[in-house]
């Protein structure tokens, strides 16, 4: 494929070394690493099984929706993880019960399936379940928790226990999910979610896990960073890593360029334009961009993406945009204007051939997604962008930094 990415079919287990320090200071209280693995997304799994996505209804093309806790509605937005490709591992309880989770900057709550989930929910049958009776450190809370997705509702109740993440143990309130829709979660490689957002995004105002880690004073800096391997197409390859308390210079070059957040409470920054080739095509008057580790693709409003796809000559196929594979290498660069710099993706970064599809058509890792106010309308920069640019989330200074990944 002349260097451009082929999407993997395999599911992988995580290797997590909380105290691994290759290339980092030997003080284990300074940095903590979480190693990630790459997996097929739920959407890929559905397509591989021959599921007609059009029959699932239009809600499957809307990856975002408002959330609610009990009778209160939050303006927070959370992905439905249809296209999520990276997961890591945490332990909950004493002794730790291990779960594969998505680390998501677009949300702030932690949740995993509960042993109290009825076997009538097929998704629970296919996932690891937290059993409070097996944990000596468990504390009951019981507050009802409901996460409303565009593809269904995940609900349960809050509990408290010790969570181990990256070698750090922290007492954390989390959701035990007792109701999960079969689709999409039955096909998910991950069990649950660890939100890396702010308390303003947290359903029920539950203190996010990173805030609780910071309160222990075990990290050198109030930051965490994400690296997604651009060459993780085989089972032996590291999918990526998260560094708590800093960044890993082994995986980026040069210095970070920082952009201040629009406001405290959401990982969202201003954007000054989107260029195709040498011409600014979109966002000429300025717009917003979420930096979302829970999403695989880059997304923008339907009107923006339709204009972008017209410029690229791409055609819509159900919920994707495709081009002829032999045309992929000739597609122009796409640049995102952030903080006075242009962050450029070549066609090798945003065009891929799906392993289950015809070799004649290739998919663009760019989707339309209409996010309502107050967070939207906004672009979202997911793994397609983060694979190219190592990303640091700076809580102390309310900013996001980018450096060229390698």
From Swiss-Prot:
GO terms for biological process: angiotensin maturation. Interaction with ATP6AP2 results in a 5-fold increased efficiency in angiotensinogen processing. Renin is a highly specific endopeptidase, whose only known function is to generate angiotensin I from angiotensinogen in the plasma, initiating a cascade of reactions that produce an elevation of blood pressure and increased sodium retention by the kidney. This is Renin. Disulfide bonds join 117-124, 283-287, 325-362. Gene3D superfamilies: Acid Proteases. It is found in: Secreted; Membrane. Glycans are attached at residues 71, 141. Interacts with ATP6AP2. It catalyses: Cleavage of Leu-|-Xaa bond in angiotensinogen to generate angiotensin I. The keyword Nucleotidyltransferase does not apply. Residues 24-66 form a propeptide. It comes from the Eukaryota. The active site is at 104, 292. InterPro entries: Aspartic_peptidase_A1 (IPR001461), Aspartic_peptidase_AS (IPR001969), Aspartic_peptidase_N (IPR012848), PEPTIDASE_A1 (IPR033121), Peptidase_aspartic_dom_sf (IPR021109), Renin-like_dom (IPR034135).
